Regions:
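Q-loop/switch helix immediately C-terminal to the Walker
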Residues: 4-20
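H-loop/switch region of ABC-family ATPase nucleotide-binding domains
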Residues: 114-115
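Catalytic Walker B motif of ABC-type/P-loop ATPase nucleotide-binding domains
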Residues: 79-82
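Conserved ABC ATPase "signature" region
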Residues: 12, 26-49, 53, 98-101
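Hydrophobic anchor residue at the start of the ABC signature
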Residues: 68
Length: 163
């Protein structure tokens, strides 16, 4: 994000992208209101004036939501989420699930790079496991948890293995 800009202003540029412009039309004022609406949709509290705070003053959970909001503003068909759960507490992670699930239901393909497997497996319908740059597994989360090569690569072998 642009840390010196207010959170909602981080969405103005994506809302002027050719793709978004074709879909929504309107002028700058319309886009400002739409930016605040999108931020509210991803969990920014309008009443607490969070959309009007500089992005650099926001906690990590809000910064991650801001990045998701920027993708929503672009009307992306595919979103690559790199460690979206990293650094977040259980409550923050839980609050992201409905948003990610809704985006997926609406046709957005989510490609997630994530080491927090427990959380990832709650939302994923397909998992590709890489180990040292090589594809180790491709299948459902349930199958991944049963796969011996995946368990050994990510959880260790024998006594040190933990899920």
């Amino acid at each position: 994000p642009y840390y010196s800009l207010m959170a909602y202003k981080n969405l103005i540029a994506p809302l002027f992208s050719p793709r978004a412009r074709k879909m929504i039309g309107g002028g700058l004022g319309d886009r400002s209101a739409l930016a605040v609406d999108i931020l509210e949709e991803v969990g920014f509290e309008r009443d607490a004036r969070v959309p009007y705070k500089p992005a650099g003053n926001l906690p990590l959970g809000y910064l991650k939501r801001l990045e998701l909001a920027r993708c929503i503003a672009l009307k992306s068909d595919v979103m690559i989420c790199d460690e979206v759960f990293s650094g977040l507490g259980a409550a923050e992670i839980s609050s992201l699930f409905p948003l990610l699930a809704r985006l997926n239901r609406e046709g957005v393909t989510l490609i997630m790079i994530e080491h927090r497997l427990k959380e990832l497996f709650r939302i994923a319908n397909r998992v590709i496991v890489l180990h040292y740059g090589e594809k180790l597994f491709d299948g459902s989360p349930e199958e991944a948890l049963k796969n011996e090569a995946v368990k050994e690569a990510y959880f260790g072998k024998g006594k040190e293995a933990r899920l």
